[in-house]
Each structure stands twice: as C-alpha cells, then as structure tokens.
Amino acid sequence: MAAPRAGDLAAARWVPREGVDPAALAALLERAAAALATEGAVRKASRRKTLHAIALGDGVDHLLKANDYRDAPLLRRLRRSRSARELARASAAAARGVPTPVPVAAGELRRRGLLERCFLLVPLVPGAVDLERLRAERAHAPRERRACERALGALARRMHDAGVFQEDFAPNNFLWRADPPPRLWAIDFERVRLRAPLSRAARTLLLARLERRLADASGAARMRFLLAYADEDRAAARRWWLEVEARAPRLARRDRRRWQRTATHPSRRFAPMERAGWRGWARRDADPAALAGVLDGERVGEAAFLVRWLGRLSRRRAARAWGLAQMLWQRGGASPKPLALLRSSRGAALVFERPSGCQRLDTLADRRRLEPQLAIALDRLLRLGARPEALTADRLGAAAQGGRIWLLDPLVVSPGRRPPVEVHRRARECAARLAGTG
C-alpha cells in the first residue's frame, strides 16, 4: 500500500471522539500532516494498511492508522469505514468501564461518495509495551510477571462482563506499564463486537484463543490468570481450566487447516520454490540460494539455519508438515520460525531460522538442568496433540544458555488429538527421560 500523503489528512472528513474540541482537532491534524510529510515513520505495513509513528509533541506520542480502500469491493467502499467503527467501539467499551486509550478522531477520504482511505489517530500510552513483545524480550522480573498475569485475568473478566467480544483476543492487543501503579489496557477494537455480558460458551472460546498464544506459560501462570478471572474462586478457576482445555483441540484443528491452506498458496508471505533439484514452499523473506546451498552441503550461512530431515514425504504430507510448522511458530513459538520445506530425491527437509544459541537437544552434554523447562514445553506439546513416545531428543531444540525449548519435527503433533490422561505426570516423565534423570 502506498503511504498516505499529508494532503490526504486535510481532504478527509474527520469525526472527533466525544469531548475533543473541533478547533483543537484541526490544529492537531495540521501538526499530524506536517509530521507525516517530514518524519512519518512506518511502524507496520501490509497490502491495505499502514501504521505511522507521529510526533505531535516531544517524541513519538501518536499512531496514525491508514487503510486503503481503492481496490476494495464496491459495497465495502459505500459503507462506514473501519476507522469510524473502531472509534465508535472503543468509545463504547470505555463507557462500559474497559480501560483503553480511546482514539482522538477517525477520518474518511471519499471521492464521489466512494471510500478511498480512512484514518485513525490513536494516542500512545507512555512507557507501555504490548504483552507479546514483553514475553518475547523476557526482561521483566518474576514479581512483575505475576502481577501482569493477574492483571490480564482481571481485565479479561472485566471485558467479558462488559460484553466486549474481541475476535483477536491475543497478547499483542494488551498494553502493560509496570511503573507504579502498574496498569493494563486493551487496544485494537477493529474486530470487536459489543453485546450483553458474554455467555459462558463465548468466554470459553476467547479464553482458549488467548491460551493457545501462550505456549510457554507454566501451569502456575495459567492458574494465576484464571484465579484473577474467577475473582479468586479456586473451584471456578479449575472449571474454567477444564473447559478451556476441552475447547483447545477444535481450535488446533482449525488452525492447522488454515495455516496449511495459507502457507501452500502464493501470497505476500509465502511462495512456491523450485531450485537446484529442490521444490516446495518458502517464506518470501528467506533467501532461496542460501536455503538450497545449505541443503546441498554448503557451509556458507549454515549458522543462520537449523535443518530437520523428515525422510521421504508425499506432497500432501509435506504440505501438512509445512502448515503445522507455521502454526506451531505462530501460536506462541513452540517451534522456531520455519523458512522453507523442500523435497528432492534425497527426501524432505524443513529449514528453520536458528534461534540464538539453539542446538539439537541430543547434542547437548548437560541436559539435566533443562528438566524444568522441558516439563513445561512437553506439557504444552502434549496438549497440542503430540505423541509422548515420539518426543525424542533429536526432535527437540534447546537454547543452551536461556533454557528455551523448541519442537523441530511438526509431524509428531496431531492437532485435535486428545492429550493423555494425567498430562502433567506424562510431561514430567518425558522430561526426566530426555534430561537423563528418569
């Protein structure tokens, strides 16, 4: 998508949130247009959407969302824009008591009544970071992490009691600021529906969606979250735990089918690949020459990749493995980032981007100290449908220093498969076997 021009902001029709003075908004938009013309840094870009960091004061203090409708279907261009809907929903959610940074204003640029672009000006929360990034950086202290888990449970309950059904109920849509007093905000109301207080089935679905993104969360962390959600009622928290676990297999089956379909069709992220006797699928941000070179035995760039040989696979089974690898990486990082799955007469190979310090578990001399991390990771994999007997050391990767565990062979997972009875005990037994203590 082409970035919006400063003149587009002036030509758009703007609707401010309640309480914003139109004259003050006009002055704000003038400064936003000037900032966009000179230093509108693009934070995120896709085919129809861009996100710009805008400095209206000292430092970046606003985000400008821009959506392009010029190639959208006709009926969609006649309707109200996404930005207008998000402003209305965020304002309504805030009125129902949900803490959220309400957008300042929404703008629509139309030509002859047809929507061309829409804009949303959103204030930034100073010092706040989204939970996805917070988890990835792993820089917060245990006390802060526990406080964040409880705050997330309390906010989720507050949203559901207020009738806020957020389709993308995920860690990246929550902002956390640890500065006293610590606070949590909900953001991104583009895919929100407002209802009466949510039914138990709707709550279970949303909690299961959130839980699948928290692949490396321990059982204690999940229980702290559910206790806060259940208002410290331990019996109610256990019931929620069981209901969420029962819903998870259906979500996993749907995810696997969706990612297999997405990753095996040409798009802005994926493309078919055929090179030097290899054919399959790859991410567009991967270097085809480097991938083929590593598979053919060249050592150039080898340190950047991690290769898992899967033996001879039919095209259908290879597509399943490729989709599973994408799902496991996207859903909380249970696998490293998969770059390509390629087949040749030698067999099939899955190529990952090597995480920092990652080695195959069976190559590490001292595995005993990894037993606690193994138990947590294996518990999650068993819940995703992994077969306990198939979880061997050569199918797992580990960071020798950080203790992070990754699955390297996605075919040991069958999404939708019921986890074994006493899954915690089985995970601990597998961890002890792999660490050499059992």
Predicted regions and their residues:
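Short, glycine/acidic-enriched loop or turn micro-motifs at the edges of active sites
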Residues: P126, P171, R191, S356, ...
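C-lobe/activation-segment region of protein kinase-like
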Residues: W185-E243, A386, A399-G438
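Activation segment of protein kinase catalytic domains, centered on the conserved DFG
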Residues: E137-A147, L364-L370
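Conserved ATP-binding subdomain of kinase catalytic cores across diverse folds
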Residues: L28-L131, H140, A151-A162, Q166-E167, ...
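Juxta-kinase regulatory segment immediately upstream of eukaryotic protein kinase catalytic domains
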Residues: M1-A41, W240-L295
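Hydrophobic residue at the +6 position relative to the catalytic HRD Asp in the kinase catalytic loop
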Residues: F169-W176, L391-A398
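Short, solvent-exposed loop/turn segments at secondary-structure boundaries
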Residues: L75-L78, P197-S199, R312, T363-D366, ...
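A short, glycine/Asx- and small/polar-enriched loop/turn
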Residues: G113-C118, A178-P182, R346-A348, A400-R404
